[in-house]
Regions:
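Surface-exposed amphipathic alpha-helical segments
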Residues: 19, 100-129
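Intrinsically disordered, low-complexity Ser/Thr/Pro-rich tracts
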Residues: 1-5, 124-127
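Extracytoplasmic/secreted proteins, especially bacterial periplasmic and envelope-associated proteins
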Residues: 14, 56, 117-121
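Second-shell loop/turn segments in exported
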Residues: 3-5, 41-48, 105-113
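Short secondary-structure junctions
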Residues: 18-25, 60-73, 127-129
């Protein structure tokens, strides 16, 4: 496991070594994929120019028509997870006064157990510095 740190928007997260990385052209994030399972982790961040709060962003999330919907909310973060066909999508967004950062994970329903393990292990390391 190593830690991805974004210098443009101060956030970081631990990533398994087997995941291959693609930096985004803008430098605001990175995309990682496990070549064996197709598990994808997209990390991206941007400046909180509108002084939004996590709660304001959470209530604006469009959850209509999403199957197996799961949501959670904390003081400065929220999670939305759902299924699209045979893909599970899990998004955690952290909001601070200066930065909004999102970890977007996608994995096959066939890899549900592995996905849950990765979420339980890695998402606690996702933070805005």
């Amino acid at each position: 496991v190593y830690t991805y740190t974004n210098d443009m928007h101060p956030y970081s997260m631990s990533i398994p070594n087997r995941f291959e990385m693609e930096e985004t052209p803008s430098g605001s994030g990175a995309r990682y994929e496990d070549p064996e399972t197709g598990f994808v982790i997209n990390l991206f961040g941007y400046v909180n120019i509108n002084d939004e709060t996590a709660h304001e962003m959470f209530v604006d999330v469009d959850t209509s028509g999403k199957a197996d919907l799961y949501t959670a909310e904390g003081d400065n973060w929220y999670v939305v997870s759902w299924c699209e066909d045979d893909t599970i999508i899990y998004e955690k967004t952290i909001v601070t006064d200066s930065t909004i950062a999102t970890a977007h994970l996608e994995y096959s329903t066939a890899n549900r157990d592995m996905g849950s393990k990765i979420i339980d292990t890695l998402l606690p390391t996702f933070q805005v510095d």
